Amino acid sequence: MRLTFNQTLSTAAGHPDAAESQEQKLNVTVVFTCVKATVAAMKKAGALAESLGARITLVVPQVVPFPLELTSPPVLLEFQERRFRDIAKLSPVEINVKLYLCRDEMETAKAVLKPHSLVVVGGRRRFWPTREKALARTLRKAGHEVIFIEAE
């Protein structure tokens, strides 16, 4: 297992990285929602990635509230890095963690994903609409293939 940790310290520019666009290896993207749901999504993404010979990208849109500068998140980046390294250790395949400091997590997730990406989103099991289900629906409408995993 190899882990690459990238920190993006600005809002998404609306385009995937040029270096990533040229890579040929299939990518399964997991969008962070909450720890429990993301762990469930990572397990499903790990199984998919193993069977497809793909790698996993964990996209973490961290919302920074307006009173704070975008480069000054309320949670220390070192803490976030440790937390996501621990989550990434659960996967049997290569994982690339991308942390985006942003104002709107849905817009950031839409902006940083390559067109027609395979995305796994974890969420809570509820009868009413949740933030996670809204994210999955938004990404589907944007043209991505989305798998929603319900966490217990």
Where are these regions (language model features)?
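A conditional alpha-helix N-cap/helix-loop micro-motif detector
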Residues: 38, 77, 99-102
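Short, glycine/charged-enriched secondary-structure capping and boundary segments
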Residues: 43-46, 72-73, 112, 133-136
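Structural beta-alpha unit
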Residues: 1-22, 91-119, 126, 135, ...
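Structural motif
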Residues: 31-35, 100, 121-126, 151-152
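Short, aromatic/basic amphipathic alpha-helical patches
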Residues: 73-87, 130-140
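Acidic, proline/glycine-rich short linear motifs
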Residues: 2-3, 8, 12, 47, ...
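Short helix-loop-beta junction
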Residues: 51-52, 83-93
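Small/aliphatic-rich secondary-structure junction motif
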Residues: 19-71, 142, 151
